């Protein structure tokens, strides 16, 4: 059995397969998933699992170079934003970029995979760009 926090087989496989510059998205329950993009659906019910719990586990295994958020998130200020900002201050998320929600949906078409959470706070969506450990 694995010793690290991530136990989900599909998610572990995707993170292990990421190359430099690949995009992995963590999204709320309402974010559309484009055809052809792998969906790892973790959502069980409203709020389970929540966005922050999934982000914490993903960051335990993934090297992040940068991240992308929707500008609308800054207006709505869902609870996840405060956690993202603190992780950003700790340099765990690399460079931050803000784009429109529509542009984030367009960016999702290029994602290697999208992780759907049970999060139901609006605009709780994040694109993580894979970095390298060397």
UniProtKB/Swiss-Prot annotation:
Keyword Heme (UniProt): no
Pathway the protein takes part in: Carbohydrate metabolism; D-ribose degradation; D-ribose 5-phosphate from beta-D-ribopyranose: step 1/2
Catalytic activity: beta-D-ribopyranose = beta-D-ribofuranose
Signal peptide span: none
Gene Ontology terms describing biological process: D-ribose catabolic process
Subcellular location: Cytoplasm
Keywords annotated in UniProt: Carbohydrate metabolism, Cytoplasm, Isomerase
GO cellular component, one term: cytosol
Subcellular location, principal: cytoplasm
Regions that span the bilayer: none
Residues given in the record as substrate binding sites: 28, 101, 123-125
Keyword Cytoplasm set for record: yes
InterPro entries per the UniProt record, alphabetical: D-ribose_pyranase, RbsD-like_sf, RbsD_FucU
Superkingdom of the source species: Bacteria
Subunit structure and binding partners: Homodecamer.
Function of the molecule: Catalyzes the interconversion of beta-pyran and beta-furan forms of D-ribose.
Family of the protein in this entry: Belongs to the RbsD / FucU family. RbsD subfamily.
Protein name in UniProt: D-ribose pyranase
Species per Swiss-Prot/TrEMBL record: Pseudomonas syringae pv. tomato (strain ATCC BAA-871 / DC3000)
Taxonomic lineage: Bacteria, Pseudomonadati, Pseudomonadota, Gammaproteobacteria, Pseudomonadales
Name of the coding gene: rbsD
């Amino acid at each position: 059995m694995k010793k690290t926090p991530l136990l989900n087989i599909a998610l572990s496989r995707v993170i292990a397969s990421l190359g430099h510059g690949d995009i992995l998205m963590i999204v709320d329950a309402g974010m559309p998933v484009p055809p052809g993009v792998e969906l790892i659906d973790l959502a069980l019910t409203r709020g389970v699992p929540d966005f922050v719990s999934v982000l914490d586990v993903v960051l335990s295994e993934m090297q992040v170079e940068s991240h992308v958020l929707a500008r609308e998130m800054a207006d709505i200020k869902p609870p996840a934003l405060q956690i993202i900002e603190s992780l950003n201050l700790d340099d765990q998320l690399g460079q931050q970029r803000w784009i429109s929600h529509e542009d984030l949906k367009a960016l999702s078409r290029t994602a290697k995979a999208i992780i759907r959470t049970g999060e139901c706070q609006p605009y709780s969506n994040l694109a993580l760009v894979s970095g390298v450990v060397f």
